[in-house]
Design a protein with these regions (language model features):
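Membrane interface segments of multi-pass transport proteins and intramembrane proteases
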Residues: 44-52, 92, 126-131, 176-186
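Alpha-helical transmembrane segments of MFS and MFS-like solute carriers/permeases
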Residues: 19-23, 103-107, 151, 155-156, ...
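N-terminal, membrane-interfacial amphipathic/helix-forming hydrophobic leader that caps
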Residues: 1-102, 109-112, 116, 120, ...
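Alpha-helix initiation/capping motif
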Residues: 97, 128, 132-136
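N-terminal start-of-chain detector that recognizes signal peptides
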Residues: 48-52, 60-63, 130-132, 164, ...
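Transmembrane helix-loop-helix hairpins at the membrane interface
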Residues: 113-116, 134, 138-268
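A general structural motif at alpha-helix termini
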Residues: 91-94, 105, 189, 238
Length: 268
C-alpha cells in the first residue's frame, strides 16, 4: 500500500506545476506581442489602421488575441505531441444544468464574502492599494453610441469570461487535475490566474489588488468546476462580475463614488 502510493507520487510529473501555467500565460503574452507587431507593420506599409474607430479597433484586436490564444494553447500540444484536449477535458461536454444555474448566485456570494477577507488582509498586512483599478481596453470617453457600448459589453462581459474560463478553469485546471490533488490544482490555477492579471505592460504599475481579487475569484470558480465537472458556473460567475463592473464603469458611473469605498474590488 505504502509502496503503491509512493510510486504514484514519484510518477507524477511535477514539472507540470510550472510548465502548464507558464504555457497558458506565455501563449497569451506571445500572441499579444505578435498581434501588436503585426498591427505596427501594417501601419508602416500604409494600411490606415490609425483612422479606424478606437472601439472597433480594440474590439477586433481583443477578439483576435483571445481566440488565437485559445487555439494555440489547445492546438499546438496536439500538433506537436498528439496531446488531444477534448470538450470533456475543458468541462464543456454538455449544456448548463439547472443545478449549475441555481448554484451560480450562491457561488458568487461566497466569492464576494471571501474576497472581502483576502482584500482586507492584503490591505492591512501588505499595504495593497485597494482603490487600484484593472486596465481594460475601453474607457468611458470612448463609448458614445449604443453600438459602441454593445461592442465593449460583448468583449468584456461575454468574450473575456468565456475564453479565460476555457483557458484557466477548463484547460489549465483540467490538465493539473489529471496529475495532482484537488487542492493543489485549485491553488496552482488560482495563483496563475491572479498572476495573469498582475502585469499589464512596462509602463503600468503591478496590479496587486486585481491579482488578489482574481486569485480569490479563481478559488471559488475552481471549487465549482470540481463539484460540477463543468465550467458553466465559473463562466456565469465571471460574466456576473464583469457585468457588474461594466454597469458601474460605463452605465451608472455616478454610483461609483457612493459604493467604491465599500466594494473597491468590484471595479476591476
Amino acid at each position: 500500500m505504502l509502496e503503491s502510493s509512493s510510486k504514484k507520487i514519484k510518477n507524477r510529473k511535477w514539472w507540470l506545476i510550472l510548465a502548464l501555467p507558464a504555457w497558458v500565460y506565455g501563449v497569451f503574452l506571445a500572441v499579444e506581442v505578435v498581434v501588436s507587431l503585426a498591427v505596427g507593420a501594417l501601419i508602416k506599409i500604409g494600411v490606415p489602421l490609425n483612422s479606424v474607430n478606437s472601439v472597433i479597433f480594440n474590439t477586433v484586436l481583443s477578439v483576435v488575441v483571445y481566440i488565437l490564444s485559445l487555439i494555440v494553447v489547445i492546438g499546438v500540444p496536439f500538433l506537436a505531441k498528439k496531446r488531444r484536449t477534448t470538450l470533456s477535458n475543458l468541462g464543456v461536454n454538455d449544456w448548463p444544468t439547472f443545478l449549475e444555474i441555481f448554484i451560480s448566485p450562491f457561488a458568487f456570494v461566497a466569492y464576494f464574502l471571501l474576497t472581502m477577507v483576502t482584500m482586507s488582509i492584503a490591505s492591512g498586512v501588505f499595504s495593497v492599494d485597494m482603490q487600484q483599478k484593472q486596465a481594460i481596453p475601453f474607457s468611458q470617453s470612448m463609448l458614445a453610441t449604443h453600438w459602441q457600448f454593445i461592442m465593449a459589453f460583448v468583449v468584456l462581459v461575454v468574450l473575456v469570461p468565456i475564453v479565460e474560463e476555457l483557458l484557466y478553469r477548463g484547460y489549465l485546471y483540467g490538465k493539473l487535475r489529471n496529475s495532482f490533488s484537488i487542492w493543489l490544482s485549485i491553488i496552482i490555477t488560482s495563483i496563475a490566474f491572479g498572476a495573469a492579471h498582475l502585469w499589464v505592460g512596462p509602463d503600468s504599475p503591478l496590479q496587486w489588488a486585481v491579482a488578489v481579487d482574481t486569485f480569490t475569484l479563481s478559488l471559488v470558480m475552481c471549487a465549482t468546476r470540481e463539484y460540477t465537472g463543468a465550467i458553466w458556473v465559473p463562466i456565469m460567475m465571471h460574466m456576473a462580475k464583469n457585468g457588474i463592473a461594466f454597469y458601474f464603469l460605463f452605465v451608472n458611473t455616478g454610483a461609483i463614488n457612493q459604493t467604491e469605498s465599500l466594494l473597491p474590488f468590484i471595479f476591476m
